[in-house]
């Protein structure tokens, strides 16, 4: 397995293309209003449409509603979902797209238990 690079918080096409041409494998769009890098799905769509083949477009969420995930994923033409909140495995599993689950590392955390809970996740992102 090789290391993959995702550049997150993209809001402009020129930044996305610069990231990709510099070697990024994936481009992340933050669909969380509390972020300074928040983007609307209608703004993300032309950026995702400009991406070369084999670049993964990722929607980043923090405790979203299922309607918001469906809407943004469809409009923005996403290829992968990334959840950073307290989303349950059942919540994450309901979407047609693959997902990554972020885990906020705590001193007493059992990583194996967490990995077992999110078995459907394509990856776990360890956030320190």
Feature roles, as predicted:
Residues 1-128:
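Conserved N-terminal beta1-alpha1 strand-loop-helix module at the mouth
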């Amino acid at each position: 397995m090789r290391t993959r690079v995702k550049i997150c918080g993209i809001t402009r096409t020129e930044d996305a293309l610069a990231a990709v041409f510099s070697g990024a494998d994936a481009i992340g769009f933050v669909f969380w209003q509390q972020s300074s890098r928040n983007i609307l799905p209608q703004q993300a769509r032309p950026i995702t449409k400009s991406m070369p083949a084999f670049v993964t477009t990722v929607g980043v969420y923090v405790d979203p509603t299922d309607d918001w995930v469906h809407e943004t994923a469809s409009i923005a033409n996403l290829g992968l979902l990334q959840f950073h909140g307290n989303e349950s495995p059942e919540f994450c599993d309901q979407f047609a797209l693959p997902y990554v689950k972020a885990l906020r590392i705590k001193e007493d955390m059992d990583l194996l238990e967490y990995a077992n809970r999110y078995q459907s996740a394509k990856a776990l992102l360890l956030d320190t």
